[in-house]
């Protein structure tokens, strides 16, 4: 039977559809086959590596920081090991009630309230979101064993060995060595911290901060194979990278000088500071501030009360380094600058005579000597010896419109950055006509510059503001004959084997032209002030076997008792070191600061002073 004509197109269409469907099926199978072949053959290695990585855990191994040593090798800062309790917050239960329960239990184990646990998490996540949270350091082994036995209950909790700074002598040179702490979010953005991770520790102050790149080591990596539950498998330790310890930093600090200075300040029990420096090369042999603090306080969490006592106490303020960050009038120790300005500008010569009748009168106001004494006719050397205020008032009056005091203060380093390698310094202030007249024009003071301002400045009073380090630079420049040293505390870097791998070089900042005759006259006056009766410090240094040049100072501070100062260059006449001591509310310079300076010089020269009877002088 032959098909009807109408059936032929219908069968053709059906065959076409079957052919199309068959082609599509073949194409789909071809795509599927190619994809399987691609996964298993071409990308097989890639997915095998990913599968292996899913069975491997990497843990950063923190590197110990280098030690900080005194110049003789005495350890000022080292490390100790500690066990830290870490929490991965992404492993906490998603259910709020279960999360609260786990955090409460963790807090109980770590002796922390739930509130404190949450605050710790919040504060650390603000710095580095996603990083493990350090709940507590110095946890005991009993807690470690308990967590190992109950790992399923605390899947996000681990214990890691960390290195914590240790200070063998407590607060010794605290402001110099500084502190360390976890890197902040802002610091992570800085180029100098490239490659670091949240939770890493870096120097935050002192040499720990300035020389962090030497002290900070390189973290290592430990790789461990884990099972499907994320638990370590037996024998699962894989190839690891050991951490590289940091290098040791050797300071210029002389331990005996440092200890003597700190003990002298502590004995007085009043806020103060000292600086002892090699004037030839700028090496800081000792520098301290009182009250001080133990840097170990930064190695563990602080209470708000502890933090406030350290930072916000308006009187003690232990965190402030009074040697570099203070701002005081210096009293009669400034007379050295006045003398040099007058000599170098031809206002007087060493043999010029000024009559001291006990006071000068200016605009109806009398400026008197301390104690109301009068010394009669004086040249420069005896004027320095007895610290005649009238002599220097007269010099200030003669120079009041010349800007000589301001120029020489600046040349010698007052109210000028010293270049100290510790960073923070108070700027200081040398009052001038321009400064006060601008304040007056802006309505910030009641009067413009006057002769009385310069008269006050000539004796280190009035609006003068400086710190012990700046005064040390000024005296050093006089002692060297004009070379301005760069003060520094870093000497060299050693590797772990004690080999010197870097020596620091600090070149002089500038040279000031000082006439040798001017220098000689001033040093002679300072020598007689310190060791020849009736010098103002002869009762303190008269029995010291090393000849020195020194000057007492008594500064008036509104709202405070007099501040005590002493500045010394030793040995005289060719000094190697300078020592500056100041004690707030310490009274006359010979009462507090001078005896403290004597203790420092006795330690440096390893010689003791004998008691002397001296009428001495007043300021």
Identify the role of each PLM range:
Residues 1-304, 327, 349, 403-413, ...:
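Periplasmic/cell-envelope proteins involved in peptidoglycan metabolism and beta-lactam response
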Residues 2-5, 77, 227-240, 280-333, ...:
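Beta-lactam-recognizing serine transpeptidase/beta-lactamase-like catalytic domain environment
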